[in-house]
Amino acid sequence: MDKNFYKNSLNIFNSNFSMKANLSEKDKFYADFWEKNQIYQQILRKRRGNPRFILHDGPPYANGDIHIGHALNKILKDIIVRYKTMAGFYSPFVPGWDTHGLPIENKIINQIGSKSTLEIRRKSNDFANSQILAQMAQFKKLNLLTDFKQIYQTNTPNYEAKQLKLFKKMVSRGLVYRALKPVYWSPSSQSALAEAEIEYLEYRSPSLFTSFDIKKGNNFVAENDKLIIWTTTPWTLIANSGVAVGENFDYVRIKNEENFYVLAANLLEKLAAIFDWKHYEIIDNFPGKSILGIKYLHPIFEKICPIVSGNHVSLDVGSGLVHLAPLFGEDDYWIGRENNLEMVMHVNDDGKFNENAGQFSGQFYANSNKLITEFLEKKSKILHLSFIDHSFPHDWRTLKPVIYRGTPQWFVSIEKIKKDLEKAIEEIEFPENWLKKRLTKMVVERKDWLISRQRSWGIPLIIFYDQNKEPVLDKPEIFDYIISLVEKFGSRIWYEKTTDELLPEKYQNLGWTKENDILDVWFDSGVSFFAANISDEKPPFDIYFEGSDQYRGWFNSSLINSVIYFGFSPYKKLLSHGFVVDAKGNKMSKSRGNGVDPLVILSKYGCDIFRLWVANSEYYNDIVYSEAIFEQNVEIYRKIRNTVRFLITNLADFKPKKYELTEVDLYIFNKIQKLKNEIIQNYDQNRFVRVVKIINNFIIEFSNFYLSIVKDILYADKKESLKRRQVQYNLYELLQVLNIAIAPIMPTTAEEIYSFIQKNNKQISVHMEEFFKESHFDEELVAKWDEFFQIKDSVYQLIEQKIKSKEIKRPNEVGVLLKTDSDFIKSIDLEKLLMVAKVEFSNEKTEILQLNWEKCPRCWNHFEKINKVCARCFEVLSEIVPEKNS
């Protein structure tokens, strides 16, 4: 008989499940399929009434295209939501957008110029809405399980009104107050900033040692003695109104050449080296409290200022005498208030000096350092000038330096709710304890929350001032009236109507005015737990999951707002991920020139491979993107797909039915049950990288062992043989497990696989299926197979030696004389399991036997020749062509 006859007699099937994925085409096909059949909506209807699981989406900013960090974040969330949904939970996912703030406002001002606030707001609102639509179209390409018709955004009247209800609650609890305080001020944004809006970057500052002349001395210091002062902000010397000393620190009066100087005793040696003093003399030694009240001449203007006590004075740097400019530093401010020091403000909103700066008026603050230094040099007041590179606060939007500047601002007291915040944090679940400490530090140790901003595009601070310019905070009916207007017309009403038109009738025509500031944008997004209206579900929600920068941002503001409004955290569990970095560990961004467009990646690789890269990343650290790493994930995908294709192809004639299994089939079945349990455990812990690794390792092990030994049964046994059906039963079990296991990570491929699976009660989509439950598996049975694998390794070492010496070509040519006294080993089909021609047992040693048997032309196994084919193939062929095989 010819080769084709034998080949055609084998159980070889074709499959429409292609080896090539063509993911870009299939992504669109299945996205349309899910939308057309309203799969998300069907899932929610099916799960309604079940235990709920809510992952609340932190809103990205509605400006520009999505970047790779956005894609990473949304995919991680989607994997969780898909898994929880398949695990039986009611898990609606409502995407949100953050719409107010400086980037949009600046963009509009650059387009239309300095128009009215109303025009800026109208254009900003239109722009934000257009950006939401653009980003939405891009997010859809990530195959997210959601309904983009059901979203939340911070610029809708309903959201804005709820935000203001929370603000009213803060006011009613006495947490909101107005104060003149130094705050972070951004000249580039011309607005106050909260700590959450500060980014620390490298910056070069002058390191200046100058001197102030004492006007009138006492028993320890004399007129014209020089106080040594150190500063890195010479521009603040204009606003100097005092010098602070440590009351209990030791100070010295020293003479160098013709001058007398005062400085901290502990810093004398260090400063003498810096100033190159060779022959100084210590005249006196005294505690700081001995010179309190001593007056000195201002370094620039003709006025007298005092020496006062300061708890913040340090002996780590400087001279032990600290120049005070009360409106340009927090410590300076409180010391200034306590000692009634003059509060000088010489810097305008744009960072330029006003008339209080005298001859320096009109200069930009940073440029004035050089001019002021030159001025002091002419007066022989410079002891030393150098420059230092150090970490310095910058505006996180413009990346320009910020300053501390005293302005009247609105604050929310954190001090009053610290115990409530600490209690709420104790109830939150963290994957690692250090993350709990991180949130605690950033929330509980923060200063009072600066909530006012001097901008146009945001939610107005709905506060009125009476005829005496005092804020009216004790009239809840006024807040209720405004909130009802905002709920109906949106926050624009605050700018469209006059003050009297915004007030209830009894408060009209009293000469009141309204506040012009807006609320911090972190206040906007930080009320989403309350304002987003997530399928009528109420907090606390199960998970908040954002980038690690949100500990100071959204996690922070959301917690504060929720504790104030509800008395508890808005989230039960907190997860965070790192930033996407390049192969060198640099954060990816367009500004650095190393950014990568996620849409380009999607177009090249398809969504499932992009999602696989996300799942296969240790997201709790920074995530490395490189072509090499992506190709590794392509290989993992290919391995999964090829395995699935093999399973589908070899199940073409299988009708799902339970079979009693052989020892080895039972072993594999139990391994599959163990696989299921490990997958569930790692999905439950949100360890997706472990899910991918477990699946990949199982496939490698399964292919190397089980598929190697059962291909012969699948292809060459009778189609209906029990052995073949037992193998197919395992293949079917694994196919179902893989299909469900990869569905949260690779929804397109999972849906495609599902279309090839035969089963009863099949759903319209794999994503409507239930995730498999944890299964019992026989640990003892699995463990006892370790003995077989030890024997297999030792036998194959001997076989490899034979192959290497070219005595044989393949393992199936040889016999094995096996030394063992194990009943288990003797009971299993070793010829199949070791893929050798023959196994016999020995009491002496294990060795390889060269048999010189014939190779069966049908199955290629080696056999003792009786017929043209081996006994098994003879039996199979006899049913096809009786009496023609002998």
UniProtKB/Swiss-Prot annotation:
Location(s), subcellular: Cytoplasm
Could you tell me what reaction this enzyme catalyses? tRNA(Ile) + L-isoleucine + ATP = L-isoleucyl-tRNA(Ile) + AMP + diphosphate
The main place the protein resides is cytoplasm
Q: Which GO terms describe its molecular function?
A: aminoacyl-tRNA deacylase activity; ATP binding; isoleucine-tRNA ligase activity; tRNA binding; zinc ion binding
Give the motif span ('HIGH' region). Answer: 60-70
Q: Which UniProt keywords apply?
A: Aminoacyl-tRNA synthetase, ATP-binding, Cytoplasm, Ligase, Metal-binding, Nucleotide-binding, Protein biosynthesis, Zinc
Keyword flag Protein biosynthesis: yes
Which positions does UniProt annotate for ATP binding? K590
Question: Is this entry keyworded Transmembrane helix?
Answer: no
What's the entry's take on its domains?
A: IleRS has two distinct active sites: one for aminoacylation and one for editing. The misactivated valine is translocated from the active site to the editing site, which sterically excludes the correctly activated isoleucine. The single editing site contains two valyl binding pockets, one specific for each substrate (Val-AMP or Val-tRNA(Ile)).
Query: Subunit details for this protein?
Result: Monomer.
Q: What is this protein called?
A: Isoleucine--tRNA ligase
Which species does this protein come from?
Mesomycoplasma hyopneumoniae (strain 7448) (Mycoplasma hyopneumoniae)
